[in-house]
Amino acid sequence: GYQHFFGPMAGGVDYFSHCNASGQHDLWLGEQQHRESGYLTDLISRKAIDFVKASLAANQPFFLSLHYTAPHWPWEAREDAALSDSVKDNLFHLDGGSIETYRRMIHHMDEGIGALVDCIDRLGAAQDTLIVFSSDNGGERYSDNWPHVGGKMDLSEGGIRVPWIVRWTGQVPAASLSAQTCITMDFSASFLDAAGVKAHPDFPLDGQSLLEVFRHPAHQFERPLFWRMKHRNQAAHRKGTWKYLKIDHHEYLFDLEHDPRERANLRDRHPDQFQSMKAAWQAWDATMPEIPDGASVSLGYGLESMPAR
């Protein structure tokens, strides 16, 4: 586990009261509840900067896993403290928010990331620090995942294709682009490789190192990817530009190079490719633990709250 922790345990909390959807205070420093006034995004940014400063002052190598709750609901920017009491019983905030509020929430996060990067540069650690920015899923509510269809809780591209930005001064060519397909589990393999550390033999990694891609963005290797989700009985497999997708009882085959919006179902035009992709997903799924029958899915909102995406 981590040596230090600061933040909430729940996925979303009020940005000012720091209470979760059950109304319980949910801000922790290590394993102890912590109370500190302030906008949560700013508090997380300051703690991250303090950690980096202390590590560099002690000449101690560090790994910082920085997870903002922004721009997760409730829809509160830095200037919206007055909203805190009114949303305490409805953190999903289904009747609130706006594109402008969403923009400001992202801007506050961006300010914190910028301050952290400035700190690393100012302390002369840029060439020794690999920085990765990404997201756990596509956006929901006020975000726009164009040109992709869908969002959070979907295995269509709008739900799973997210930014992946890397900075490592002297190692990653500035302003370069890569077409390499990758997935979150590749983080750990890449970080260990960059640090020159082997994974523990008792805990083999599922991910693959992207270090060669970092240094040579034109380099690519085949990286089959698999997903499954209880919500709507979804399944997906990507290999190269091909993608197999199942939603409810409907199955699709897409060529993402020519159809990133997943509008042209090619399963009947390319039946062999479709069956191969489906069989590969089934073989992978057979190696995974079964999803318990009692596992539940709660979106927090539905068609009664807003139209479908």
Where are these regions (language model features)?
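Beta-strand elements within well-structured catalytic alpha/beta cores of enzymes
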Residues: 62-67, 106, 113, 130-135, ...
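Short, solvent-exposed turn/loop segments enriched in Gly/Ser/Thr/Pro and often Arg
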Residues: 8-12, 65-74, 133-141, 206-207, ...
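Polar, surface-exposed loop/tail segments
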Residues: 127, 167, 174-235
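Formylglycine-dependent
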Residues: 1-61, 68-77, 88-94, 100
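Active-site rim elements
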Residues: 32-39, 96-103, 151, 171-182, ...
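Loop/turn elements at helix/coil->beta-strand transitions in domains of secreted/extracellular proteins
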Residues: 1-3, 58-64, 125-131, 221-223, ...
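Histidine-centered active-site microenvironments of extracellular/periplasmic hydrolases
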Residues: 1, 73-79, 83-86, 111, ...
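Long, internal low-complexity/basic segments
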Residues: 187, 239, 248-250, 256-309
